[in-house]
Curated annotation (Swiss-Prot):
Name the record gives this protein: Small ribosomal subunit protein uS2
Record keyword Ribonucleoprotein present: yes
GO cellular component entries: cytosolic small ribosomal subunit
UniProt source species: Clostridium botulinum (strain Hall / ATCC 3502 / NCTC 13319 / Type A)
Superkingdom, taxonomy of origin: Bacteria
Family recorded in the similarity comment: Belongs to the universal ribosomal protein uS2 family.
Amino acid sequence: MSVISMKQLLEAGVHFGHQTRRWNPKMAPYIFTERNGIYIIDLQKTVKKVEEAYNFLRSVAEEGKDVLFVGTKKQAQEAIEEEAKRSEMHFVNNRWLGGMLTNFTTITARINKLEELDKMEEDGTFEVLPKKEVIKLKNEREKLEKNLGGIRKLDANNVGAMFIVDPRKEKNAILEAKRLGIPVVAIVDTNCDPDEVDFVIPGNDDAIRAVRLIAAKMADAVLEGRQGEQLAE
């Protein structure tokens, strides 16, 4: 049984690539044909590549390592958050802050600040502070939550893989992963460079349904791997 079927991929529109004038020639092996000025992705290859990525992420989770889900474009934000939470993993879906992995000490300080502001809100500190001050602190908290909420519990040393939607948009995340030797799994559209990615999943990175389908399969892989890890214990 394949991890994913051609029918599922077709229904989610995974086969629609970008316009032919916006393409990366390195994606040629994954292109099936061209229709009305748009490249059509070879879904037989996608089926195979989803399977490879699935098996890899499952083995990462089996080893007790974490997977960081990254997708900051509008079409990916919701699916990235939901699927990361479902598989009890970490995510970045608003903005990749420079040094998120390579300068984790600074990021940790900001996460601590977020925790501190949460505590102030919970223990009633906000109620005794001047209104102006509270508004300022609440705005700061909101901004930190937006950018760092998904990595609050992250241990940067335990990231075994990164799952990315659109490597072109997330080039900074990829650079940091490369520097730290973290393998990257990504949905790669016809306008991206597949050489930047360790596990290429050729597919449409602009359709919400397509992104959700593949992100869900990657989360399933993590869940299956975690089950295996528990059984091994």
